[in-house]
Amino acid sequence: MAALQMDPELAKRLFFEGATVVILNMPKGTEFGIDCNSWEVGPKFRGVKMIPPGIHFLYYSSVDKANPKEVGPRMGFFLSLYQRGLTVLRWSTLREEVDLSPAPESEVEAMRANLQELDQFLGPYPYATLKKWISLTNFISEATVEKLQPENRQICAFSDVLPVLSMKHTKDRVGQNLPRCGTECKSYQEGLARLPEMKPRAGTEIRFSELPTQMFPAGATPAEITKHSMDLSYALQTVLNKQFPSSPQDVLGELQFAFVCFLLGNVYEAFEHWKRLLNLLCRSEAAMVKHHTLYINLISILYHQLGEIPADFFVDIVSQDNFLTSTLQVFFSSACSIAVDATLRKKAEKFQAHLTKKFRWDFAAEPEDCAPVVVELPEGTEMG
């Protein structure tokens, strides 16, 4: 890790007040990062010092000893660090990952007594990017991390999956309407259909809130179905009531958690969840009136998040549609409503102007949501 320039007084304060994370035996050449900075570690690397207290995300990619250019999948984990805290971790050579098992208290205390000698092997926290990190995570609490992180705490770019059925025997394959092993495929589609159904290994999946697929209440009339399909406030409120009953603002922590897992952890499923959750928030006009403070904070969150991603990232390769512009177009249209809080309305107008100037996104065209909506009625629903 390269030396960083820091104000001497700040460096002194962080040296005595900051937290320290020691990682023993991490192989030379491993790509390692904390929050918004990453490096290739050298042979003397033992961890990071002078870390400001709070939530942090540490991540790494192992390298192939035989071919150092071959880098493994990104893995990471969140830590909640305290003033003058010391966390001791070690590299597992067998699993090629950081072992998150807590070190014995005796080892931690011995390490604390030896910190001055260890100091030369610890890289200083990149304080220059702390402001950016806080802007991306200011709604992520320790409770958010505990609720959402996998049971094993390891966040991996690639899911650790197992087949739902082992299908070791012919009778198992017949039960799934699959041909015998070794039978030649007649088409690409048939080959895909033969692939076994997979599920995440227990304890490895991120525990995101379940988002509704049905946007209207049971027994809704056709008119109500249409209403709730255009304004998703009912569906959003069910999520807030079930997942965040004491504080609706906590949904913003989950939005930030998903974004960090995607941006720094390279977790595609987290990006998909971020999109679905953002879509639910942006298409809920009635909720903007009820939860105006939540939406004021949402704009600030999006301002910082969108600064980290190229403008064309959200464009669908096939359709050329931009998910974000179409979603925000509906949001800005709803935010213009006279019923919406004046502060929220003004902030939305400024944010729209900022995006138009920075990314040249066009929000002036009529949103697709203004076109007639065709909704699928539940089976058995009668038209009045």
Swiss-Prot record:
Task: Write the record's keywords in alphabetical order, separated by commas.
Answer: Acetylation, mRNA processing, mRNA splicing, Spliceosome
Could you describe the subunit structure of this protein? Interacts with PRPF8 (via RNase H homology domain). Component of a U5 snRNP complex that contains PRPF8.
The protein's matches in PANTHER family, at most eight in alphabetical order, are given as: A1 CISTRON SPLICING FACTOR AAR2-RELATED, PROTEIN AAR2 HOMOLOG
GO annotations of cellular component type: spliceosomal complex
| Name assigned to this protein | Protein AAR2 homolog
Record GO biological process: spliceosomal tri-snRNP complex assembly
Concerning its family, UniProt says: Belongs to the AAR2 family.
